[in-house]
Each structure stands twice: as structure tokens, then as C-alpha cells.
């Protein structure tokens, strides 16, 4: 069974890393290899992808879609099923949490169009199940970003335990970071992000 994915260049590192990993794993890109510039460029590249998808999918393929896929998600799922393909979605974030543009029932309905969901952790899986999601799910458990930097083989133990956080630093999405002083005074916190 052949596998494919839709590459849509994003400002989101996690999504871009998944595109790279899918390519390395032999998945066929049915998206765009062109990196658009500006809102109008992005709109036309995405529109081109949406229009060509029905002609790029082959019977019995597995299509991986990264979520959120803001527009045309349900359309893509329907086209893939019409072409007798299986649809797998890797969830990075849920719209009902992220910006509350979707209600929880709307999101669950949107996700009901797929065959399998890959979630980040058991908590996300449990939450989706509690909200009525019936789609089979698997957990990544941990998501590591790709890096050109060579990993350190040995890290010396320090007298003060260290906690390292890498990710978004904005208070809107990560308010807990601004409340840690009250809880981890005996730890050294190293924060990486913007």
C-alpha cells in the first residue's frame, strides 16, 4: 500500500519536520514543493493543491493529513475516500482549544471523516474519546524536533536540577511558564523559543 502526504509549507516547525520525515520515509508528496510568499501566494498554492488532489491520489493509498488543516479538510477526506484511500490525521493542535473558532462538537464531527488519528499523548486521546470521538487512535508519546545540531553524548550532572523547555513563549498559549516561579524554586529553568 502506497503512502502519501500533503506538503504545505508552514511557519510551524512541527509541521515542516513531519513533511521532512514523511519524505525520508518514502511517502509521496502530493502537495506543493514550492514555498509561497505572502498571503495571496499561499492562497493560490493551497488552491492549486486542493484542485489537483483528486488526480494525484491512487486507489488504496494512505493519505496523511496534518491537523489543523484550516480549510478544505473535510473535502480532502471525502475525495480520498471516494478514491478508495485511507485517511490518517496527525494532530498537532485542536482548533477548539487553540483559538476557539470551532466548538468541540464541530471538531469531533470534522475528525469523524478519517480512518485513524495520531495524537501526541494519552491525555489528548482520552479527551477526544470523552468528547465522543470514535475514530481509532494511536499516541506518539513524545515529539522531538529535527535539528542539525549534534546531540551531546554526556551531560554533566549539576548540583541544581535543570528543567529545559523548548516551544512557544507567548502567554496566550503557555501561561503556565509565567507561573512556574512559585513552584520550582529549587530548579534551574532553561527556556528556548520565541
Task: Write out the residue ranges for each language-model feature.
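Carbohydrate transferase catalytic cores enriched for Leloir-type hexosyltransferases
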Residues: 4-12, 64-67, 77, 90, ...
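Conserved catalytic-core segment of nucleotide-activated headgroup transferases in glycan assembly
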Residues: 152-194
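N-terminal pre-catalytic "stem/leader" segment of glycosyltransferase-like enzymes
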Residues: 1-74, 81-84
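Membrane-proximal helix-turn-helix segments that form the acceptor-binding/catalytic region
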Residues: 51-58, 78-83, 96-117
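Helix N-cap/beta->alpha junction signal
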Residues: 67-69, 93, 121-123
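A short, active-site helix/loop in glycosyltransferases that binds the activated sugar's phosphate group
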Residues: 99-102, 114-137, 174
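Short, hydrophobic beta-strand segments that form beta-sheet elements in well-ordered domains
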Residues: 5, 28-33, 63, 116-119, ...
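Short beta-strand->alpha-helix junction loop in the catalytic core
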Residues: 139-150, 169-171
Amino acid at each position: 500500500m502506497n503512502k502519501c502526504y500533503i506538503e504545505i509549507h508552514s511557519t510551524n516547525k512541527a509541521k515542516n519536520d513531519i513533511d521532512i520525515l514523511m519524505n525520508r520515509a518514502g511517502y509521496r508528496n502530493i502537495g506543493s514543493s514550492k514555498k509561497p510568499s505572502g498571503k495571496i501566494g499561499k492562497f493560490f498554492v493551497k488552491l492549486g493543491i486542493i484542485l489537483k488532489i483528486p488526480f494525484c491520489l491512487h486507489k488504496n493509498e494512505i493519505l496523511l493529513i496534518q491537523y489543523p488543516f484550516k480549510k478544505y479538510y473535510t473535502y480532502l477526506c471525502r475525495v480520498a475516500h471516494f478514491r478508495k484511500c485511507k485517511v490518517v490525521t496527525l494532530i498537532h493542535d485542536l482548533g477548539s482549544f487553540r483559538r476557539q473558532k470551532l466548538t468541540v462538537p464541530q471538531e469531533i464531527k470534522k475528525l469523524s471523516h478519517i480512518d485513524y488519528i495520531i495524537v501526541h499523548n494519552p491525555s489528548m486521546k482520552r479527551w477526544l474519546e470523552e468528547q465522543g470521538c470514535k475514530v481509532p487512535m494511536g499516541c506518539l508519546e513524545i515529539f522531538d524536533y529535527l535539528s542539525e545540531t549534534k546531540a551531546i553524548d554526556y551531560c554533566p550532572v549539576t548540583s541544581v536540577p535543570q528543567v529545559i523547555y523548548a516551544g512557544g513563549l507567548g502567554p496566550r498559549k503557555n501561561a503556565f511558564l509565567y507561573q512556574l516561579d512559585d513552584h520550582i524554586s529549587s530548579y534551574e529553568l532553561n527556556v528556548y523559543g520565541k
